Amino acid sequence: MLTIDHLTKTYGDKKAVDDLTLHIAPGEIYGFIGHNGAGKTTTLKACAGILPFDAGEIRVAGVDMKTRPLDGKRLLAYLPDNPDLYDYLSGIQYLNFIADVFGVDKDTRAARIRDLANRFVLTEDLAQPISAYSHGMKQKLAMISAWLHEPKLILMDEPFVGLDPVASHLLKEMMRQHCDRGGAIFFSTHVLEVAEKLCDKVAIIRQGKLVASGTMDEVKGNASLEDVFLELEENHDA
């Protein structure tokens, strides 16, 4: 579903992502773990087609994101850590705008918006301007917009930060359901307990370089993910 092959991205003389190779298969929830500045957000933005990169290839369902970026973007949704929505629109206007962009017909979008807004308890707020939304409400609206066109791949940057427990539980359910239907999810997180319970596979990145990846058992063995992460950090600092 998502193939990252020798990805390199440089800012000035610093390699934010250094020769990164990963493969996320259909049906997988893949966690991306690392400290702030490790290269997680840069990688996700490159995969989403909104950040040019210096070397390597990124393919979404076989579509090359460098040569066919529009075709690739139609197959995915990207949720940044701080959704930058159009504050002058109402919630429903924003969702209709997203549906228009992805060519979702009116009957289909109405049914999906109704279902998703009910699940996120946002129905009564859709008529309100986004400028009146709290951070948590904006996150929920962004999540509805991500699922609205039923993408094959969903990319998320720290999706659980700021969510209340009910919304967090719902998001986990929706992530699993999406992958059970053959989709894939690649998301960054610093909440190791969430990754340990939710992910089929994880990758750990440090200073732009991949230091561990694989199934949870392959990466952590009998230890906790937190122990493995800290041990890798200590080994690289030594």
What are these regions (language model features)?
Residues 56-67, 71-72:
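Conserved ABC transporter NBD signature motif
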Residues 213-214:
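ABC ATPase "signature
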Residues 154-158:
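Catalytic Walker B motif of ABC-type/P-loop ATPase nucleotide-binding domains
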Residues 96, 100, 108-125:
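Conserved ABC ATPase "signature" region
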